[in-house]
Amino acid sequence: MERFKAMRKWFVLLLMCMLCSTLLSCSDDDNDMRDVAVSPERLPKVSKDFLSEYYHGVKISSVVIDYDDNVMVYDVDLANGHDVTFGPTGEWVEVDAPEGETIPSGIVPEIIVNYLDEYYSGYGVNDITKTGLGYEVELVNNLDLVFDAQGNFLYIENL
């Protein structure tokens, strides 16, 4: 009888452990890091310098610290509708203008600008994103072009 009580205790303990394990694995904790609105003063100096150079006089609407693929980024919304994403060290990762508008030309690397002038003259850059392999550039006509890290054209993405 004592042996039966001891086995029952172990069985109940095992059931409770399994239940706790199941409940914890189903919890909504896969995004522990939440978006946090912060003051523009919290931006790294590199980001502030970028905004001052390319968006001088444009008011910052909001700054949010976000985690994209567990990497901290600063998402900055500007009063003119442009959005700039900065990496953890403050370097720009993406610059996006509203539909039909262009981003400031000085942001795009010169070799890419030269390519666009030759092959897509008259179509400004609506969005540019730094990727692990180079750059993705969206033109105002919604054509997506991919360039390597040196700015050499690779392919058209959405054909």
Predicted regions located by residue number:
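First exposed extracellular module after export/assembly in secreted or surface-exposed proteins
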Residues: 2-4, 35-159
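Bacterial N-terminal signal peptides that target proteins for export
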Residues: 2-13
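Hydrophobic helical h-region of N-terminal Sec-dependent signal peptides
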Residues: 12-20
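C-terminal motif of bacterial Sec signal peptides marking the signal peptidase cleavage site
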Residues: 21-25
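Bacterial signal peptide processing site
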Residues: 27-30
